[in-house]
Amino acid sequence: MDHEPGKPWFHGSPVELRSLHAGSKITQNRALARAFSHKPTFVTVSHAGEIRHNGTEQGHLYLIAEDVQAGDVTPHPRTTMAPGEEWLTTRELRVEHLWVTVPVPVPKKQLRENELALLAGQLDSL
């Protein structure tokens, strides 16, 4: 469950930021960070890597603007993502705003109501 040294790190948020505090979620998967920028309550990633979510807010995609060392991140202890996809920061990190993200109402990317109910039921059984 290692991260890839030298590969960029990203953070998605509906809020404008200058830095992240310790405990913030980051990922090396830019598309996943973009999905999180829309403040979804559910995110799924298929085995083929297709990301679907129910987020509807305009958001912001950020690049972590400094080197991230092994001690700067720890695997998210309660993630539902594949190992290595979602990390928590252990210290404050500067970010660079890349762009504003707008949720695209593409049926293929949005989770349907029956899919959301199924996911909610799976979480309740954990």
Residue ranges and their predicted role:
Residues 1-8, 13-24, 28-126:
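Conserved NAD+-utilizing ADP-ribose enzyme module
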